[in-house]
Amino acid sequence: MAGGHCGSFPAAAAGSGEIVQLNVGGTRFSTSRQTLMWIPDSFFSSLLSGRISTLRDETGAIFIDRDPAAFAPILNFLRTKELDLRGVSINVLRHEAEFYGITPLVRRLLLCEELERSSCGSVLFHGYLPPPGIPSRKINNTVRSADSRNGLNSTEGEARGNGTQPVLSGTGEETVRLGFPVDPRKVLIVAGHHNWIVAAYAHFAVCYRIKESSGWQQVFTSPYLDWTIERVALNAKVVGGPHGDKDKMVAVASESSIILWSVQDGGSGSEIGVFSLGVPVDALFFIGNQLVATSHTGKVGVWNAVTQHWQVQDVVPITSYDTAGSFLLLGCNNGSIYYIDMQKFPLRMKDNDLLVTELYHDPSNDAITALSVYLTPKTSVSGNWIEIAYGTSSGAVRVIVQHPETVGSGPQLFQTFTVHRSPVTKIMLSEKHLVSVCADNNHVRTWTVTRFRGMISTQPGSTPLASFKILSLEETESHGSYSSGNDIGPFGERDDQQVFIQKVVPITNKLFVRLSSTGKRICEIQAVDCTTISSFTVRECEGSSRMGSRPRRYLFTGHTNGSIQMWDLTTAMDMVNKSEDKDVGGPTEEELLKLLDQCDLSTSRCATPNISPATSVVQHSHLRESNSSLQLQHHDTTHEAATYGSMRPYRESPLLARARRTESFHSYRDFQTINLNRNVERAVPENGNLGPIQAEVKGATGECNISERKSPGVEIKSLRELDSGLEVHKIAEGFSESKKRSSEDENENKIEFRKKGGFEGGGFLGRKKVPYLASSPSTSDGGTDSPGTASPSPTKTTPSPRHKKSDSSGQEYSL
């Protein structure tokens, strides 16, 4: 018994009412009924009035399974209305006071926390863009207008519509696709170019522009789209466009479909067209005036702003890419690095394909999983010095260089580092550093790069600098936009300091900004309105046109309530460079544990060791290790990775809880899942035979990578099909036969590439082309490639980097 707590209150002897014995976490407390019940609607008033069932120990004391150390100052407050912390942190005490419902105490503690936190942010806070209005929905407007504008005939329209996204008919003329439900208010992706940024929401995109005099202004809002956006690209300087050099271009993609708009400075915008890659789009970006889309399956789509021509090219399965000037470099799963000269686009008149040239082949034949190209100051239109760093599926990091004196023999292997035991997922070669990241919880290794007259040197050569981790947990069932909207970096120009952005858990309002070279923490930012950060990016903006002014670097964060917040990283880096404080990296152990209070982690398939229902079954929300989605490690060296359990709101911060009361994502998702199941059930015929739509859905799920997860709606649909007559062994045999046939077709259609030399003399890169790369037929007026000529999917042998999406993640759903 705690002697200082039992019977020590004199009011009990003064007729203040019945004495109540409490057992809080094993420690006995004695107090009066009046002391516990003077605050209405508290935990104690409900407990003593019988509204809450009580559990008593062997002595008859009411047992409360809470922290006794934190309960002591709370009981003292109930007795005296005075607060004595008694060594308990304000944060812990506030959590306990909220549990007990002691409202006066909670208000005092929240006010104490407000002393250090402001709704206007810290000195690094730069601006706030409120959530935009959601545009009105127009039924079938996008597809119809695009077809008429591009002049697609019926065959091409069918090829595009039946590619990978089966549709279900809803009420009236509206058609929607089965897909992963996404909160329509949440900012999925933030991207920027020069003084413009674009925020991608589930069904529309919004462009903002900054001017020194007026600040940030909303310029363009796209029409409402029936499908969910997964990729976005922005070009704020289109040279030679139809409206002069003041044109801007915005593109968004979902699955295989791409839609492109032209935006003028005045805010008016017009749709350029809708294009199809024929396979899921993994990357969407601009190289000059060209819009480029790539897919891991081995397709590259290019649209030129001058010629208005869309072309799709077949290459081998792509595992990485980078850009250098007007060149697109592709790292492929056969160990080769290829490049495409965009200045020679749209096509070579001889055989109607892109100029794809093999640049280098890895000596170990490992897949090229990361690429980084550095153009030295010696490089020019007539120059021929280039440096390329790349990482492989076996964990090797290599640097190859093209010397002026080796023009005819191709790039030479310069350095090799074998410090990673997992596939390399990111690599960056800059002026002063070489940075590589592997799939082991974003393990980072860095080296200093020695240069002589701007070119990499062997004396004394690259030396190890730092080793650290950018721990970042992700949900296994996240939407396809999560990877592009939450990319850790590194961000920044290659001749300047670069940074990583660390988001430890998916549902958090805090980010850590760290130097990419050493891992040193530059700053940590916290949402000013305490809402969850759903996406982020780092861009440099030229806010002033005055002489001597320099671009400033900003961190843009998108939030689940639709707002965008901006943070001044230039000021943060200036402050940290002047500071002499001890270097701090990522979150400390205490900070990490506090962040992990929001979720459960498990190294087994069960979230809890007891027989109670796992929260993963209840909430369908799991966490996994970051960057494990690539799964490019060789089969012989595959290791069992920890599987994180589900998230749950345990000891959730009230600041987060207060903001999340306005976020209805989970209820929205559950509502969509219920309607999804009903629509699929109606679509299955009574006799159990599959109609063409069901067959498409089933085929899409059968061809998907084995590591992908199915959405709950598709799983229920499959079970109903089995119950209505389909036999399990027949399905297994059919899948096995189709997989075998696909493998045979893949071997028959495999493209043989000849190893070519490097750069030819006189040019920046040589003109040695790949002997033959099949070009998908396309029309000069924006036609799409036919699925019948698409290359066989390589995902049977190469896992898709998009595996964290559900099988139906690109398909729309019905309300």
UniProtKB/Swiss-Prot annotation:
Polar residues composition bias: residue spans: 139-168
- Gene Ontology CC annotations of this record: plasma membrane
- Ranges annotated as biased composition (Basic and acidic residues): 736-758
Query: Compositional bias (Low complexity) spans?
Result: 774-800
Q: Where is the BTB domain?
A: 18-87
| Keyword Cell membrane among UniProt keywords | yes
Q: Does the keyword Protein biosynthesis apply?
A: no
What the protein does comes down to: Accessory subunit of potassium/sodium hyperpolarization-activated cyclic nucleotide-gated channel 3 (HCN3) up-regulating its cell-surface expression and current density without affecting its voltage dependence and kinetics.
Any idea what this protein is called? BTB/POZ domain-containing protein KCTD3
Native organism: Homo sapiens (Human)
Q: What is the lineage of its organism?
A: Eukaryota, Metazoa, Chordata, Craniata, Vertebrata
User: Its encoding gene is what?
Assistant: KCTD3
